[in-house]
Amino acid sequence: MPDLPSGTVTFVFSDVEGSTALLKRLGDRYDEVISEHRRLMRERFTEHGGVEIDTQGDAFFFAFARARDAVTAAVEAQRAHAEQKWPDGVTVLVRMGLHTGEPAVGSEGYLGLDVVRAARLCTAGSGGHVLLSETTRALVGSSLPEGVSVFPLGERRLKDIDEPERVFELEIEGAIQPQAPVRAAPPADDADWETDLGARMAQRIEASVRRSVEASLERVVSDVDALAERAAKRPGQVAERLEDER
């Protein structure tokens, strides 16, 4: 058993969504994908102080002494999976759940509901999701990696957790965007969750359009600058063209 962080600890659970489908598609090359997935996860998480508690198949359980380090590791791992060239053009979709608490430590490792809560946050997500509990969100504050924002999902029901949990999603530039909504349902009396989801989708579309427009404007400015530079070098030709157009 490794030396475990104690006191206030942030847990991260992760797994690969659709691993059975990947196995069917890739056959013998599936082992290559899982080996690379494990390498990417271990490199990013241990680099930021994560302690590997357990792993099984494509799933991991890490512990961190600081919530900010856990978030940074999760972000970098998601971006690394997006950048990786996978066999046969497949996409490896990783979901993660982060929760911070003050767990008890027994002879076999961590004990208590804090571990369960982090695990349930992971399984509440779909591939590409990084979900935070309210405690982790509060500890991270504004100390987010560049290109990362936090979107509140409101209260959600997590399996085996009696009270609803306020859940937050990391929106990460340069990572694979989730293709499915969060699986955990809101409380039965929350009538606004569909409206919240629609507003969130609208915000994503608006952000995508804004990035596209900004990129187009940058290209236009670049083209105009190039034309201006060319005109400065050949003023006579430009003047002749203007005269012809008259």
Feature roles, as predicted:
Residues 1, 128, 135-246:
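Intrinsically disordered, glycine/charged-rich C-terminal tails and inter-domain linkers
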